Amino acid sequence: MMDVAVSFEGVPIRLTHERWFHIVENHDDVAGYYDEVLETIENPDLVLRGYRGTLIAVRRYGRRRYFMVVYRQVSADDGFIITAYFTSKLDRRHIVWRKP
């Protein structure tokens, strides 16, 4: 089983149930945010350049709380989610896209 969200560049990004369980295992505070992971890919406030070719979709939750979803676009028609987490830190030097 899996769900798919479309990135800001129009690339379908997969979230398998196995990957979701892995994410929740390492970030239990994200456990109730399955739909928000997909929504963050589809409607981010901004996207950051991550490490080793990854992208990070970001949604703001409150004044200094950000929801980060790390993903990789393998091709123009395929990608997958790596992890998701909350943070209070945001490195604005790596912004590649911002919601208009």
Locate each region found by the language model:
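Ribonuclease/tRNase effector modules and their secretory precursors
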Residues: M1-P100
